[in-house]
């Protein structure tokens, strides 16, 4: 629910009458959108209406298939990753995973939750899964497992007693 991902949702929602989905854990962040906008010099940001709480679903119909909704909290409480393809070959990770990095936790996130998400949810994903992040270049899980210091144990995300 950070500004850089949801700041333009309300005017789009109003103009196009499209639904908005977000992980329910991000409701408090979303409620602060107008204030966060002011902190970055953006006046008049409005909080969008949530039409679908992603915490309540595991899949969303899409064309002739489905998008798998995988809960990946840590960067934000309601963080989700979206997997496409029969075996989740393509992933939209938002800020849960970047090429050679991960999202920050100091704006409503939780480093310990994030470390568990990495260990229990992200690391088990197949090596062939394409990683499309909210910022920066794309990658694959194989590259991230090998080279990302937050995934391969070189850097600690904030929970030193949690074995990765």
Residue ranges of predicted features:
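Active-site HxH/HxHxD metal-binding segment of metal-dependent hydrolases
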Residues: 1-65, 146-154
